[in-house]
Each structure stands twice: as C-alpha cells, then as structure tokens.
Amino acid sequence: MTNLAYHLPTFIPAWRIVTEKRDRDGDFALPASLMRRMVCVKLQTIMWKQEFLMATMLDVSLRAGVSKATVSRVLNGTGQVKESTRQQVFTAMEELGYRPNFLARSLANQTSNSIGLVVSTFDGFYFGRLLQQASRQTETHGKQLIVTDGHDAPEQEEQAVQMLADRKCDAIVLYTRYMSEKTIMKLINSVQTPLVIINREVSQAADRCVFFEQQDAAFKAVDYLISQGHREIACMTVPIHTPTGKARLMGYRKALEKHGIRLDERRIKYGDAGMTRGYELCRELIAEKVPFTALFACNDDMALGASKALHQAGLKIPQDISLFGFDDAPSAKWLEPALSSVYLPIDNMIVTAIDQAIRLAKNQPVEAIPPFTGTLVLRDSVTTGPYFNQKSSSASSS
C-alpha cells in the first residue's frame, strides 16, 4: 500500500494532462508547452513524495513519549523542559530524520530566528575577525547569522538593512563607515526590526550604539610618541570623509595641542587605508624633505606600506624614523622590527552588539553602553627622539 501511495501521484496527473490534449486525429500531441507542464507536475509530485514521507512534529512526540507542545518548546528554546526530556526529543528527531521547517515557522511567527549583519566591506583582517566573532555569538543564542555588505556606499548599506528587515530578521547590526547620522536615525525610526549600530556614536540613539573612542585611542598613540621625545611627527590618515578618519586625525591634532607643538600641515598626508597608499604617501614625505622623526599611520596597512618606503630610502626603523600603527593587525608583530600599534577590542564590541540586538528583539530593557577604549601595544618600532631628555613645555616647536 505504501508503494502504491508513493508511485500513484507520478502517473495520474500526467495521464490527465495527456488525455486532455488529443489532437483532431485522435493522436496524442505533446508540444513543448505541454512537456513543460509535465515537468512541473513531476516536480510537484517529487515535493509531494518528500512531504508524504517526511517525519512530523507529531511523529517526534510519539517516538519521544511526550506531548507535541513539549517538542515545540524544545525546538524553540522556550519554557522549562527537563534535560532528560530534551535528550529524548533530540534522540527521536535523529532516529526519524526530523528537520524543523524554519521557513514555515518564520512565516507563521513573522520572524526568522536570525540576526542580520551589515558591514561596509568584506575586505581586511578587521572584518574577518568581526564576522567570525559575530557568528559565534549568534550561535550561542541559538540563532543564525545573515551577513551582507554595503560595498562602501551609504545607499547600498541602507538597502542592505531594508533587505534584512524584509527577511524578518529578529534584529540587525549595522557597521557603517559612510552613512550619515540623519540616515541612521531615519532607519532606526522607520524599520520595524530592532537596529544596533557599531563603530558609530549617534547621540540621539545612545542605547543603540556600540563604538570605540577612536579619537582618544589616536591621542594616546601620538601622546606616547611625544613622551618618547618626538615632536616632528608626521601623520597618514585613513579616509577623512569617514567618522573614523576624522576622529583619528583629531586625536593626532589634540595630542600636539596638549604639548604646545605647532601643527605643520605638510606633515599630514591623506590616505585611503591601503598599503599602496601608505607607501606612496611616505615616499611623498621623503621626497618633499618634510622633517619628521616619527610617523603615525592611522592603520597598520598604511604603516606596512610606509615601512617599505622608508627601507627603500635607506632609513632605518626605529633608529631614523619611529613608526606607530593602528588596529594591531596580525601582521604587526611579524614585521621587522615589530610594529607598535593600537589594539581595539573588536571581539568585545561585536559580542556586546549582538547581545544588545537580541535584548531589543525580545523587548527587554536596554541601557546605553559605555564606549570601548583602545590599548597601546608597544613593540620595537619606536625609540627615543631628540627631545627625550627635555620637557615638552620648554622645547621649541618645529
């Protein structure tokens, strides 16, 4: 009987279609359009077979000896279920080959049991670390992570957020480099899905933001160089039209200002965060004969490019030029000499953001999260400068 039920639907629909399509001479006509219809029927039949043979939640409950409601609680992670009962349910699921239909459940509940993540780009170690930790943290909450990128364009970042909202993500985490604060607030207020912003401070949505003190971290790096006797300090920026780029440059300026060092605009080179640009900008500094004893690169990739330019010019690190990076990339400790840099706790930031997003999704109360701070990682690329034995306040600015 089971075999008959399995095979019967394969033939009956096709027979009906063919008998309805006899030509005038009584012969069967099978034009291309009909063949397409028969293929569709065949596909529908295969789906029917799978559904006919697929184990259901009721089957699991009968095999485990528990109610269907208990199986549902185990699958959804809701309610109180004894561990022994949970194991019974999981054993029954494995024996029956049961797979929950998450798509059907999401349509019924208007959720997807997933967290969306929008990043500016997939390039670089920074985003690799962020994605890895985001995936792990999402899994600890029993949810899936859906990731998309904004192609370094605010319009596409906005579209990505809307796409994830349309997919009924429980919450969305947005890492944006370029989106304006006005657009961020528009999304927070218009998108029904809870939205958490990382690496950006939005004053009107303090409980939705998880960010670094970028300016303070850059200030610490340049302040350290000054404390080591450097006053002629050059700076290579990351894109200045981004909040991160502006904040790191401001940290550089504030450190000089604190020590009464006059800002020399010739020592500031505006970059794009890449190794090639770091190499080119450092060559410009050398070619223009701008005097400097230390170089602050606003990310480690640019510092790496600068190190090659210095080497080609016959300048030694740190004997001739001290070099300080930012982000503490994995490559920093493998440079020769090892690169001093600023470490930002990316892992802690994304874990906090995921947790905050899930609290919002559950309509739990949330509070503003204090900003994360950077830590100086001191290695071998910095040595004392010409003013090391003098007080900063008494040294003449260059």
Name each model feature, range by range.
Residues 136-181:
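Central regulatory/effector-binding core of bacterial HTH transcription factors
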Residues 88, 126-140, 217-221, 243-262, ...:
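Short, solvent-exposed amphipathic alpha-helices that sit
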Residues 219-261, 266, 369-382:
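An alpha-beta-alpha
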Residues 152, 174-220, 261, 301, ...:
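Flexible loop/hinge segments that line or gate small-molecule binding clefts
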Residues 52-56, 94-132, 140-141, 151-152, ...:
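N-terminal helix-turn-helix/winged-helix DNA-binding helices
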Residues 5, 9-11, 16, 20-21, ...:
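N-terminal helix-turn-helix DNA-binding module of bacterial transcription factors
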Residues 13, 283-398:
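Flexible loop/turn connectors
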Residues 210-235, 250, 254, 275-284, ...:
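Hydrophobic alpha-helical segments within soluble ligand-binding/sensing domains
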